[in-house]
Amino acid sequence: MTVTEITPLDKRRSKVILDEDFALALYNGEIKRYHIETGEELPEETYREIMEEILLKRAVERVCYLLKSSDKTEQELRKKLKDGYYPGEAIDYAIEFLKKHRYINDEEYGRRYVEYHSTKKSKRQIQYELQRKGLSKE
């Protein structure tokens, strides 16, 4: 994989774009530690190491942090991670971790949402909101 571009996201993190279409966010110290530079080749073993030692764990920590304040659907969590430049492999790993430990359950979320909002919103509004959150009509 070739590092196409490194763009700062904030003071501490940068977006690393690989092969012009695949992006991931790393802290500047991690970029230095793995000697990642624009135009250079990123060896597969280095990528695997970054994925396994950093990104998979960070994705799980991020979704747990997001769930701390309020329940979310699988789709909402996937979108948040994607917006945070987590690769698909890390997103899938984090979602599977949550499902395995029963931190997320879209069916249960939908049931609680309907129960809570049934007196305040119409049936159609509730259906629309649940579809927007990634849940089916049922």
Model-identified regions with their sequence ranges:
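An alpha-helical, amphipathic repeat domain used for nucleic-acid recognition
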Residues: 1-138
